[in-house]
Amino acid sequence: MFDAIDAALADIKAGKAVVVVDDENRENEGDLICAAQFATPALVNFMAVEARGLICLAMTGDRLDELDLPLMVSKNTDSNQTAFTVSIDAAPHLGVTTGISAEDRARTIQIAINPVTRPEDLSRPGHIFPLRAKTGGVLKRAGHTEAAVDLSRLAGLYPAGVICEIQNADGSMARLPELVEYARKYDLKLISIADLISYRLQHDRFVQRETICEFPSQFGEFKLYAYRNLLDQTEHIAIVKGDPSEFGQQPVMVRMHSECLTGDALGSLRCDCRMQLQAALKMLENHGLGVVVYLRQEGRGIGLVNKLKAYSLQDLGYDTVEANERLGFPADLRDYGMGAQMLNDLGVKQIRLITNNPRKIAGLKGYGLEIVERVPLLIEANDYNSHYLTTKAEKLGHWLVKNYLLAIAIKFTPNVASAQQRYEKLEKIRALLQGTPLMVHEDNRPVAIALFGKNSLIFHVGLDQNLPSGQPWQKHDHSPYPALVKDFLVQLKQWPDLQALAFLIAQGKDPMETLQVSLDRENVSFADLTADALNQWQPQTVYTYSKQGSGEMTNR
């Protein structure tokens, strides 16, 4: 479907435009891009008539500073952080009249990139919209702005590009099927930003490995790889389990973790960052191979002081997203270019990504890494972070259990006592549910242990989507969930070391928060754990199935 980057660079160098597509989970659009030095009146007119979007001039920050072109706004609230400067026309003494004609806009572009042009040679505002590209290009930000500058630079031309969003004739945004046809119709090369990132990853780097050291921890034996970002001199680390020489031969379990001083170091209960970090390290130790990439982007990218200001607003009743927006920031300012280069340095090709955040998947796909599996990371809520976790699920789209189906406790022979043993079992349980919408969430709360017993592996099965309305889910005729749960339980009871299995039906809400003072209990044998039994189960009853039939989950 997509053309090779080398072929696109040849066309850029020859003065032609190319169609550039970003990730479907980002802007999900295609832009027509050409090198700025080849922006003729005819090409500008083609963009205006056949692409129909806003015509912009992507330039380096250094050149925009020379021209004294500040950002259009001091606080950018655009979700993709597109960095518009004030708009411009070439000054009248340079031959521009209204500024809007194709000839005037082409002339303004040529004046802007001319090294002898001074700030007073440009009128403000105008009809060309300069965009400030991030230093580091698409390796720093996977946007069309950076792609335009990178393509021009890689083609050996002046590092500036003209871009225009491609719209359909009816004014709607052209998506990939329309963009494929558009490129075919006008004989244009079609490339993706993901491929451009991969191309640059093969040819240049902005990450430098500084040192490696042993890292014994309470979670296991690891190695720390320290890196420096050569663009901004920030320091980051990779916490590595196993031999990196083996990373290129198999999918590697990876966690991208952004620094959280209050959570990671100070144990804050307002977020789940520390619990996520610790859970990820335990998973790596159990798996024996993997990486936690620890990125220095505090407060989802807004910095420590601004994060604390957001906390102050949360104290007044705002949620985490509203607080960021109140301060003039998007909900999430993080980017994963540095982390992608660190993984590339370690030889990682395929990723089993530990995340609940769809933006991380979109961001890493944009950096040329193949994500073969998403491994959920579900964290226990507390009185302080429960609203925070709910907001992440509802407003940031995180994959967290929103609706609980049942709580399960399993007793094994011998007992599963250590953290490593629990994670081994949970990995096998997650594997049983792979390919289904069902999610697993371990529960270590005292109320769950009191209910099921301290030697039990306790977890919830639930969904990150809404339950069908009407009947209880286990009796719903047109819902897929009863059959999925039946199959899951039947597979569980076949494990040879499983002694007893107990569960409590839920109807969406966390069953540990809706327990009655007195619960019914039914103890039966594994032989009675059939597909038909599900229809008879009731809430507020603990059902225990065992090989012997006594079923009591003892050893409390």
UniProtKB/Swiss-Prot annotation:
| Spans annotated as Unknown | 403-556
Q: Where does Mg(2+) 1 bind?
A: E27
CC cofactor note: Binds 2 divalent metal cations per subunit. Magnesium or manganese.
Q: In which pathway does it act?
A: Cofactor biosynthesis; riboflavin biosynthesis; 2-hydroxy-3-oxobutyl phosphate from D-ribulose 5-phosphate: step 1/1; Cofactor biosynthesis; riboflavin biosynthesis; 5-amino-6-(D-ribitylamino)uracil from GTP: step 1/4
EC number(s) per entry: 4.1.99.12, 3.5.4.25
Which Gene Ontology terms of cellular component type are present?
A: cytosol
The residues that cross the membrane are none
Classification via CDD domains: GTP_cyclohydro2
Entry keyword S-adenosyl-L-methionine:
no
Q: What are the UniProt keywords, alphabetically?
A: GTP-binding, Hydrolase, Lyase, Magnesium, Manganese, Metal-binding, Multifunctional enzyme, Nucleotide-binding, Riboflavin biosynthesis, Zinc
Please give the family membership noted in the entry.
Answer: In the N-terminal section; belongs to the DHBP synthase family.
Q: Known PANTHER family for this protein? A: 3,4-DIHYDROXY-2-BUTANONE 4-PHOSPHATE SYNTHASE (PTHR21327:SF18), GTP CYCLOHYDROLASE II-RELATED (PTHR21327)
User: What name is this protein filed under?
Assistant: Riboflavin biosynthesis protein RibBA
Q: Which organism is it from?
A: Synechocystis sp. (strain ATCC 27184 / PCC 6803 / Kazusa)
